[in-house]
């Protein structure tokens, strides 16, 4: 609920302008609620129309993507790139290929990305893009033809100093390779225009692990500040993609026992601890569903549907699957089962009422824009390596990532305390990220 009149007017304009964009509304409301204390202290923002400009993308590109399937039939998908804010650097954000992709989802992701990128301390703005194309069930040749068609339009709007996309759901190393190859072919340039690249052509060590590792580094700092740790804790993780897999790996390395993982069909509960090598084989090599886990580990249980993952008793919950996966009923189950920490690995995985419930019950809560910033932080480090024409070791990148995540935690915590909301990392992260962007936007005039 908004109390500041200026914030209310800005939010009402967002609702009126794009009434159907529910995900975007949710993201804007959550951010404006967190920014109210700062807006109260800085009336000059209203005169400059700062919030109105902040919630409106600088540019939205929509385009058709025609491609031919293996049967020779022409297919047409829709492509997008939302270039949200470049006040502190070139647009930076992933590409998502999934049937559910629409403009509302990409605007919410791009909006969150602006603040997340600011929090890293790196000079990168925010954006997001993708398509309603579904790579699942497609041959490598079909995926290649789609990616080449997609890049044939997108290349006009991106560049190493303009907009640097990366991967997201449905866009992994294979897709990034095809996209990069087509960009290089069209521009006749070898530049760091994409991140998440293969190591043989400009990628960074530790990029694959970065979001999951960074999530655990952030959560570890939050836990230590509260006198707790991962050591001996039981952890519930949702998802089985990059974020979930490497969050599982790092949580285990920090002494925890991970007992759940999921995909879009259901989840597995392994009370003896998830066999991560098996999950990697199933998901990264064989591209199979998580249900196959129990055929190798019969002591584990498979359950249809994803929401039940939060009914499993745990100490720490790491939602790493997709937006709005952790709802109020899941939050209530976590609290009832003694969970004391929730750290978001996916983008906006918790609904507002779930977050409010967790916070009201004293649960340590890490918002995605802070806790899952490790991926884009390491993308920024990949951009730096590309610009310098060198490669850092895994340990060098991991150390820089760890330092960035520690700094993000301390920045969010200190900012929350500064504005009288000690412990509220949601508000702290929003304000800490916005302060830098607001300063840059005010300095650059009405643009």
Indicate where each model-derived feature is located.
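Adenosine-phosphate binding glycine-rich loop
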Residues: 2-27, 222, 335-447
């Amino acid at each position: 609920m908004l109390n500041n009149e200026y914030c209310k007017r800005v939010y009402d304009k967002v609702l009126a302008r794009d009434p159907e964009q529910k995900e975007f509304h949710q993201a804007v409301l959550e951010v404006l609620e967190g920014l109210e204390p700062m807006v109260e202290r800085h009336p000059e923002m209203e005169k400059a129309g700062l919030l109105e400009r902040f919630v409106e993308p600088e540019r939205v590109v929509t385009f058709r993507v025609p491609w031919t399937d293996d049967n020779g039939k022409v297919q047409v998908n829709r492509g997008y790139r939302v270039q949200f804010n470049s006040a502190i650097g070139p647009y930076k954000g992933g590409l998502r290929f999934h049937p559910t992709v629409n403009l509302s989802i990409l605007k919410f992701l791009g909006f969150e990305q602006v603040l997340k990128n600011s929090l890293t301390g790196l000079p990168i703005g925010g954006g997001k893009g993708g398509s309603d194309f579904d790579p699942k069930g497609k041959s490598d040749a079909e995926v290649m033809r789609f990616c080449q068609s997609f890049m044939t339009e997108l290349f006009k709007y991106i560049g190493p100093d303009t907009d640097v996309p990366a991967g997201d759901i449905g866009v992994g190393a294979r897709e990034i390779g095809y996209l990069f190859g087509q960009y290089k072919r069209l521009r006749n340039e070898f530049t760091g225009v994409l991140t998440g690249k293969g190591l043989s052509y400009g990628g960074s060590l530790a990029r694959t692990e970065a979001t999951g590792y960074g999530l655990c580094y952030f959560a570890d700092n939050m836990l230590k500040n509260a006198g707790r740790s991962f050591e001996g804790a039981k952890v519930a993780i949702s998802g089985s993609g990059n974020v979930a897999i490497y969050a599982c790996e790092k949580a285990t390395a920090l002494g925890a026992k991970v007992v759940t993982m999921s995909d879009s069909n259901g989840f597995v509960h392994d009370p003896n601890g998830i066999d991560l090598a098996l999950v990697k084989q199933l998901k990264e090599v064989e591209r199979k569903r998580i249900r196959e886990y129990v055929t190798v580990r019969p002591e584990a249980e498979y359950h249809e549907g994803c929401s039940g993952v939060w009914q499993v008793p745990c100490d720490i919950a790491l939602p790493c699957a997709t937006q709005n996966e952790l709802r109020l009923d899941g939050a209530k189950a976590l609290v009832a089962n003694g969970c004391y920490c929730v750290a978001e690995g996916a983008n906006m995985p918790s609904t507002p009422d779930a977050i409010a419930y967790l916070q009201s019950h004293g649960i340590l809560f890490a918002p995605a824009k802070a806790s899952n910033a490790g991926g884009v932080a390491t993308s920024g480090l990949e951009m730096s390596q590309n610009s310098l024409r060198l490669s850092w070791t895994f340990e060098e990148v991991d150390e820089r990532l760890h330092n960035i995540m520690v700094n993000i935690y301390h920045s969010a915590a200190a900012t929350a305390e500064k504005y009288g909301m000690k412990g509220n990392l949601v508000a702290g992260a929003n304000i800490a990220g916005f302060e830098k962007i607001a300063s840059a936007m005010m300095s650059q005039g009405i643009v």
